[in-house]
């Protein structure tokens, strides 16, 4: 019995010596796990860098600014010179020096020209709430073009009812857009009026020259008549009716003679002339001359815009007279405008009518227009009473 117990004790001891201890097996497994994990790629403990967002999407309204650049870039060289910049952005408020300073402000890389990026960057930084407006204009333009295509499709193959609905929606769209446009134009007119008043506070207004022309105060709405002066056998059709009053015909005749002298470079003073004004012999009119060379392929568009400009300017109270002359080459036009004062002409430059014509000129002229101004005696436009 004791011997058997001794054998079992020896066998158990040998078995324990042959088997690794449990703690050793656990430690080996832990070491193998640690080794395996160390061989795996490990993630950095630092915060992950944000993914590259790619190029930033253009700000709203950029397409409109690019269109402005295209119209201002007269020679299509992809950049605006100072002359092109002043021609396009002149509004009658900023003078040439102020426009030049603005040009160099926008020209951030000091290359003496403004490229598309510089123009977009400047206006985008100053757009404010107009960013949404200009972005909406981009969307509206696309939507209107799409709707015009739909309208054409309906009118080619739609039923009478479909055509009625489309016609109604088209008219309503026009009414809504016109309503918005009227609101914007009212704001433009209010700002222009306020700007004119601010400028007049710094400039003493001159006495009205209208009394010099007519010898009586100006009526509430002074009529203006357009003269299409003949030059080398060519003329531009008049947009208004011929003057019927004898006194007005005399004025037109004298203006025709004056313009003929201007074109022939034979301007002189009649020293024997009796001036009809008694105390205003020093009164002058502002005569503005614009000479424009039109691209042949854009002639029709230019003529349409010119006629609208002449009709609109004729109704401006402070414009005594306006005339347009077509030169012998058929593509060069000269406009003469007689204004009561320089300030009246500058206010006119801010009007929607003048800005619309200026934009058409940018698109249709083959080179920047030549503009000059001189003062002419108001007595030249006075009906003689001798």
UniProtKB/Swiss-Prot annotation:
SUPFAM superfamilies documented for this protein: Dimeric alpha+beta barrel (SSF54909), EF-hand (SSF47473)
CDD domains registered for this protein in UniProt: EFh (cd00051)
Omega-N-methylarginine carried by residues: 10
GO-annotated molecular function: A2A adenosine receptor binding; calcium ion binding; identical protein binding; type 5 metabotropic glutamate receptor binding
Pfam family, any one: ABM
InterPro entries reported in the protein's UniProt record: ABM_dom (IPR007138), Dimeric_a/b-barrel (IPR011008), EF-hand-dom_pair (IPR011992), EF_Hand_1_Ca_BS (IPR018247), EF_hand_dom (IPR002048), NECAB1/2/3 (IPR039862)
SMART domains, alphabetized: EFh (SM00054)
Residues annotated as binding Ca(2+) 2: 107, 109, 111, 113, 118
Chief location: cytoplasm
Residues modified as Asymmetric dimethylarginine: 42
Binding site for Ca(2+) 1: 73, 75, 77, 79, 84
Top-rank taxon: Eukaryota
Subcellular location: Cytoplasm; Cell projection, Dendrite; Cell projection, Axon; Cell membrane
GO biological process: negative regulation of G protein-coupled receptor internalization; positive regulation of adenosine receptor signaling pathway; positive regulation of ERK1 and ERK2 cascade; positive regulation of glutamate receptor signaling pathway; positive regulation of protein localization to membrane; regulation of amyloid precursor protein biosynthetic process
Signal peptide: none
A Gene Ontology cellular-component term: presynapse
Keywords: Calcium, Cell membrane, Cell projection, Coiled coil, Cytoplasm, Membrane, Metal-binding, Methylation, Repeat
Domain EF-hand: 60-95, 96-129
Quaternary structure and partners: Interacts (calcium-dependent) with ADORA2A and GRM5.
Free-text function comment from the UniProt entry: May act as a signaling scaffold protein that senses intracellular calcium. Can modulate ligand-induced internalization of ADORA2A and coupling efficiency of mGluR5/GRM5; for both receptors may regulate signaling activity such as promoting MAPK1/3 (ERK1/2) activation.
Protein name as annotated: N-terminal EF-hand calcium-binding protein 2
Gene name of this polypeptide: NECAB2
